[in-house]
Structures are given as structure tokens and as C-alpha cells.
């Protein structure tokens, strides 16, 4: 998903002949956009199953994937939360922003005047727990998708890599450690209050 300054677009990454071939087992995809769009339900019946639209904001898109009848596979419904706007600096917590928690006003004003693209990528994965025999043969007849070692900022299709996976794990680990430290401090504070309560009750 990508957004520009004057034109906001809802669009999947650019397809290739290889990806078109890999999506050939899909019969059609039905996108349900926000009700404010004319013809908010869009049915796409050929690869690369894209929807391109203009707009600005944040909303949920329902995506229903249909397979050919001979595949014997039920259709799949998934939801994609579209975020197509930048997060302003005043929404950033003080400890993450400029020193003292006050963002630089001149810098904020300067950034407002410079058009900046908004890139929003979300990784979705379909899991077939009990696929039909035809679907199983199709899925196992081709190699799985392997993540590249590093991300390429100029190629949206390579936004996910072993590098970004490791970075995300590091962020999760750091977040868990922060939560653990806060829980410990809270426990110590509660224990201190209980001791003070006992002292006052004597």
C-alpha cells in the first residue's frame, strides 16, 4: 500500500509474470472497501487481483478469496486494516520525541510543507489446515516462498526479509523486557504501600 501527497492510492505491490502464474489457482477475489466509495464491493477475476483507488484515512477492507469448483476448496475471508495517512509528531510519546518531550516547532512546520509518501505494508499468510487433495498437490508441487536475507527499500516486494524478521524479534524482546521491568517496579511499589499501611495501623 502506498500514498502520495496529493494522490492516495490503495494498491498492491506491482505484479510479475511469475506471481501472476502462481495466482492462477484463484478464481476471483472480492474486495469490500469503505462504504463511502462508489461501488464499494469490487470483484476481480484475473491476476494480479489488484484494487486501485484514491482516498485518505484508515479503514478495514474485507477480502474474500474464491477457488475454482474443481479444487474442492472453500472460499477464504480475511481482513486487511488499511492505514493510509502519516502519524503526526504530536502523537509520538514524549520519551520518544525531542529532548524534554517537546517537538521542535520549526522542524514540525518544515516537515508539514514537504510532501512525504506514506508506505504501509502488511504481511498476510493463508494457512490451509485440511486442504483438498487437488489443493494439496498444487501447493506441494512448487517450492515455498523463501525470504531474502536483506530488505530492499526500493522494492516493496522485498520489504519482508530475514533481516526485518530478526529486527522485529529484537523489538518484541525489548518490549517484553520493558513490561517485565515495569511489573517488577509496580510489585515493589505495592509492597512498600502494604508495609506503610501496616506501620500506620500499629
From Swiss-Prot:
Name the principal localization, coarsely classed. cytoplasm
Q: Which PROSITE patterns match?
A: YEATS
Annotated region (Disordered) at 94-113
The YEATS domain, residue ranges: 1-142
Q: Which domain of life is it from?
A: Eukaryota
Q: Which UniProt keywords apply?
A: Activator, Chromatin regulator, Coiled coil, Cytoplasm, DNA damage, DNA repair, Nucleus, Transcription, Transcription regulation
Molecular functions (GO terms): histone binding
Quote the subcellular location field of this record: Cytoplasm; Nucleus
**GO terms classed as biological process:** chromatin remodeling; DNA repair; regulation of transcription by RNA polymerase II
User: Where, if anywhere, are coiled coils annotated?
Assistant: 161-202
Q: What cellular-component terms does GO give this entry?
A: cytoplasm; NuA4 histone acetyltransferase complex; nucleus; Swr1 complex
Q: Which InterPro entries does this UniProt record tie to the protein?
A: YEAST_sf (IPR038704), YEATS (IPR005033), YEATS_dom (IPR055129)
Please give the function described in this protein's UniProt entry.
Answer: Component of the SWR1 complex which mediates the ATP-dependent exchange of histone H2A for the H2A variant HZT1 leading to transcriptional regulation of selected genes by chromatin remodeling. Component of the NuA4 histone acetyltransferase complex which is involved in transcriptional activation of selected genes principally by acetylation of nucleosomal histones H4 and H2A. The NuA4 complex is also involved in DNA repair. Yaf9 may also be required for viability in conditions in which the structural integrity of the spindle is compromised.
Q: How does it assemble?
A: Component of the SWR1 chromatin-remodeling complex and of the NuA4 histone acetyltransferase complex.
Family of the protein in this entry: Belongs to the YAF9 family.
Q: Per the record, what about its domains?
A: The coiled-coil domain is required for assembly into the NuA4 complex.
Protein name in the entry = Protein AF-9 homolog
The organism encoding this protein is Yarrowia lipolytica (strain CLIB 122 / E 150) (Yeast)
Amino acid at each position: 500500500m502506498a500514498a502520495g501527497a496529493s494522490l492516495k492510492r490503495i494498491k498492491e505491490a506491482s505484479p510479475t509474470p511469475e506471481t501472476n502464474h502462481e495466482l492462477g489457482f484463484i478464481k476471483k477475489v472480492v474486495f469490500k472497501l469503505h462504504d463511502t466509495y462508489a461501488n464499494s464491493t469490487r470483484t476481480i477475476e484475473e491476476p494480479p487481483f489488484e484494487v486501485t483507488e484514491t482516498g485518505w484515512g484508515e479503514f478495514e477492507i474485507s477480502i474474500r478469496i474464491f477457488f475454482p469448483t474443481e479444487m474442492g476448496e472453500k472460499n477464504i475471508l480475511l481482513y486487511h486494516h488499511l492505514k493510509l495517512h502519516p502519524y503526526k509528531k504530536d502523537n509520538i510519546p514524549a520519551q520518544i520525541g525531542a529532548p524534554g518531550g517537546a517537538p521542535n516547532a520549526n522542524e514540525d512546520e518544515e516537515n508539514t510543507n514537504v510532501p512525504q509518501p506514506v508506505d504501509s505494508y502488511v504481511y498476510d499468510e493463508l494457512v490451509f489446515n485440511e486442504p483438498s487433495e487437488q489443493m494439496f498437490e498444487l501447493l506441494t508441487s512448487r517450492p515455498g516462498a523463501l525470504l531474502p536475507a536483506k530488505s530492499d527499500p526500493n522494492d516493496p516486494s522485498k520489504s519482508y526479509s530475514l533481516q526485518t524478521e530478526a529486527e522485529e524479534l529484537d523489538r518484541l524482546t525489548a518490549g517484553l523486557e520493558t513490561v517485565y521491568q515495569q511489573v517488577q517496579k509496580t510489585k515493589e511499589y505495592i509492597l512498600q504501600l502494604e508495609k506503610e499501611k501496616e506501620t500506620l495501623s500499629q
